[in-house]
């Protein structure tokens, strides 16, 4: 199906099949569509609301066209990632949590990008921390194999996205592509915590990942609007495990945590996020640093559970708490910086 035919269907509020969506996405991602057509398609999809079949089709094409990171094994390899767009401008919780996971012995293939609507994307934070981002897929794999953690800079692995960049920027609205990033990890991880910007997306995206072969995934949105587990409110979870999806609410107290305000956790730029994370993972001398540490523990604990490194969410949180207080997570971040610095010299020689 070509994009003009797809537009006619969408205007009539009719869904595309998975294969039809694959056809259209392939045209978009290979430069066969005009920017006007892409903008109209994205806007039409948003107004109609994307079906599970359509999201599956779009994700499968993005995965096919990605510059993949080949790992020796995907057993237990985990990613913790969010769609962004929650408007809270909280520090980079998922990225900080990734280093707790690695320090706990998990293998982490972290996928992320620069900020679009927020103040600090995962790539912005890591760059501020002195971590070199422009790695080849082979170099990322070496990071993961050697350190237990590597970062896949989305724009380096999804170069075909450039064809949709202009229309997305001009629209200035959340579109289908905001959902695709967390679902298109270039290493092909089967274990994830995926934060989303609306509770209504939790079940559908869990179903998408179920159809695409994921093993253990938590798709989450908190009642106070975050695309991650919150200390200040219950969090809704759609969990895919053993081929089945269950939905439930989690209170911080259910996991041995104390409910508290998120005041003091918003940041204005990547450097501020880094300073808060340094405090949380290291010194914890400030009230906000302690609160940030607890936010990291909550989310890292969920990812330890998704990675099957813990038997329950509560056990994952307990393990994350123990690991964070060793200081090993901050050391792991510094190790990644030193390791990638060698690749920077190689690539710029």
Curated annotation (Swiss-Prot):
Pathway: Amino-acid biosynthesis; L-tryptophan biosynthesis; L-tryptophan from chorismate: step 2/5. Binds 2 magnesium ions per monomer. Belongs to the anthranilate phosphoribosyltransferase family. The lineage of its organism: Bacteria, Pseudomonadati, Pseudomonadota, Gammaproteobacteria, Pseudomonadales. 5-phospho-alpha-D-ribose 1-diphosphate binds at residues 82, 85-86, 92-95, 110-118, 122. Mg(2+) 1 binds at residues 94, 228. Anthranilate 1 binds at residues 82, 113. Catalyzes the transfer of the phosphoribosyl group of 5-phosphorylribose-1-pyrophosphate (PRPP) to anthranilate to yield N-(5'-phosphoribosyl)-anthranilate (PRA). NCBIfam families: trpD. It catalyses: N-(5-phospho-beta-D-ribosyl)anthranilate + diphosphate = 5-phospho-alpha-D-ribose 1-diphosphate + anthranilate. The keyword DNA-binding does not apply. Its cofactor is Mg(2+). One of its GO terms (molecular function) is anthranilate phosphoribosyltransferase activity. Homodimer. InterPro entries: Anthranilate_Pribosyl_Tfrase, Glycosyl_Trfase_fam3, Glycosyl_Trfase_fam3_N_dom, Glycosyl_Trfase_fam3_N_dom_sf, Nuc_phospho_transferase. One of its GO terms (cellular component) is cytosol. Mg(2+) 2 binds at residues 227-228. Its EC number is 2.4.2.18. GO terms for biological process: L-tryptophan biosynthetic process. Anthranilate 2 binds at residue 168. Keywords: Amino-acid biosynthesis, Aromatic amino acid biosynthesis, Glycosyltransferase, Magnesium, Metal-binding, Transferase, Tryptophan biosynthesis. This is Anthranilate phosphoribosyltransferase.
